[in-house]
Amino acid sequence: MADEEKLPPGWEKRMSRSSDRVYYFNHITNASQWERPSGNSSSGGKNGQGEPARVRCSHLLVKHSQSRRPSSWRQEKITRTKEEALELINGYIQKIKSGEEDFESLASQFSDCSSAKARGDLGAFSRGQMQKPFEDASFALRTGEMSGPVFTDSGIHIILRTE
């Protein structure tokens, strides 16, 4: 139990049914990894709660027909289902994790957000500027860490914390 308490915020230890190995899952970012996460979710906190006042992230957004605005710079009317959007997101995550593609090139080609023109870079932001699930995931990530699928009213995101 003491081992669990030392995990960074949002992380929990789980057992893989397929490989019978322990892995770590972050319920805020939906990230999973075999290696035990170390340290705090951030360093140099400036807001008195052990987290930075601002973070910088890039993201790849896949919208679906239930998104709050089902259109993008890439497509006037988005008709894909939420399930199809999640399938695309999971495929992108696999390509990034395998090294087949890098985050920035996928974001610039396939993101439904206009930030695609900046390779997914959203710049720095503080709490209260983004939709809550996106914000929570962004602040829970460590610099250089990528989330799993993050669901917001805009669609499904992969978030990469860059600062």
UniProtKB/Swiss-Prot annotation:
PTM comment: Phosphorylation at Ser-71 by DAPK1 results in inhibition of its catalytic activity, nuclear localization, and its ability to induce centrosome amplification, chromosome instability and cell transformation. Ser-71 is dephosphorylated upon IL33-stimulation of dendritic cells.
Domain named PpiC: residues: 52-163
This protein's record includes keyword Acetylation: yes
Disulfide bonds: none
GO cellular component labels: cytoplasm; cytosol; nuclear speck; nucleus
EC number: 5.2.1.8
Subcellular location, principal: nucleus
GO annotation, biological process: negative regulation of amyloid-beta formation; protein peptidyl-prolyl isomerization; regulation of protein stability; response to hypoxia
Residue span of region Disordered: 33-54
PTM-bearing positions, type Phosphoserine: S43, S71, S108
Location of the protein in the cell: Nucleus; Nucleus speckle; Cytoplasm
Complexes and interactors: Interacts with STIL. Interacts with KIF20B. Interacts with NEK6. Interacts (via WW domain) with PRKX. Interacts with BTK. Interacts (via PpiC domain) with DAPK1. Interacts with the phosphorylated form of RAF1. Interacts (via WW domain) with ATCAY; upon NGF stimulation. Interacts with PML (isoform PML-4). Interacts with BCL6. Interacts with FBXW7, disrupting FBXW7 dimerization and promoting FBXW7 autoubiquitination and degradation. Directly interacts with RBBP8/CtIP; this interaction depends upon RBBP8 phosphorylation.
Record comment regarding domains: The WW domain is required for the interaction with STIL and KIF20B.
Function: Peptidyl-prolyl cis/trans isomerase (PPIase) that binds to and isomerizes specific phosphorylated Ser/Thr-Pro (pSer/Thr-Pro) motifs. By inducing conformational changes in a subset of phosphorylated proteins, acts as a molecular switch in multiple cellular processes. Displays a preference for acidic residues located N-terminally to the proline bond to be isomerized. Regulates mitosis presumably by interacting with NIMA and attenuating its mitosis-promoting activity. Down-regulates kinase activity of BTK.
PANTHER family reported in the protein's UniProt record: PEPTIDYL-PROLYL CIS-TRANS ISOMERASE, PEPTIDYL-PROLYL CIS-TRANS ISOMERASE-RELATED
Protein name, as recorded: Peptidyl-prolyl cis-trans isomerase NIMA-interacting 1
UniProt organism field: Macaca fascicularis
